[in-house]
């Protein structure tokens, strides 16, 4: 699907933001980190967040933490839940591996959202070839506040 979120297609952004089940890759347990602040805001707005973080020993924002995106997607699927959007807070050079991991799962989430400052052309091309909607270099919190 070819959505023009880059040039202010608010109807597309609004459509994407209707998906309330998110996996957040790189969600830090540290409240001073941007990923934590954005996730807390989204949770307050009614989104169901699934944290993906290397240390899964303690919940983040009251939610079970998964070490990998695949572990989260598989566990949620077994429980009859679907993650529709993967939100990424990782360095651009790490994004391709996250995209590849996501595509190894079934069902594949519908949207891959790279937060502000994050772009990866190779990951974008790979995901779009599989029908995934890709958003780059946009803050989900900011986009949500613009519309709601």
Positions of predicted regions on the chain:
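NAD(P)-binding Rossmann-fold cofactor-contacting core
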Residues: 32-33, 40-61
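Conserved beta-strand elements of the Class I
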Residues: 23-25
């Amino acid at each position: 699907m070819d959505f023009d979120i880059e040039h202010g297609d608010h109807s597309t952004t609004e459509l994407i933001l209707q998906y309330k089940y998110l996996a957040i890759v790189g969600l830090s347990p540290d409240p001073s980190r941007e990923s934590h602040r954005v996730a807390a805001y989204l949770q307050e707005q009614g989104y169901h967040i699934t944290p993906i973080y290397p240390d899964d020993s303690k919940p983040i924002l009251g939610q079970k933490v998964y070490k990998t995106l695949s572990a989260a997607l598989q566990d949620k699927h077994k429980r009859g839940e679907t993650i529709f959007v993967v939100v990424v807070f990782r360095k651009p050079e790490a994004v391709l591996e996250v995209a590849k991991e996501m595509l190894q799962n079934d069902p594949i989430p519908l949207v891959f959202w790279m937060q502000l400052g994050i772009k990866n052309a190779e990951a974008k091309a790979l995901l779009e070839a599989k029908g995934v909607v890709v958003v780059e270099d946009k803050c989900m919190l900011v986009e949500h506040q613009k519309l709601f």
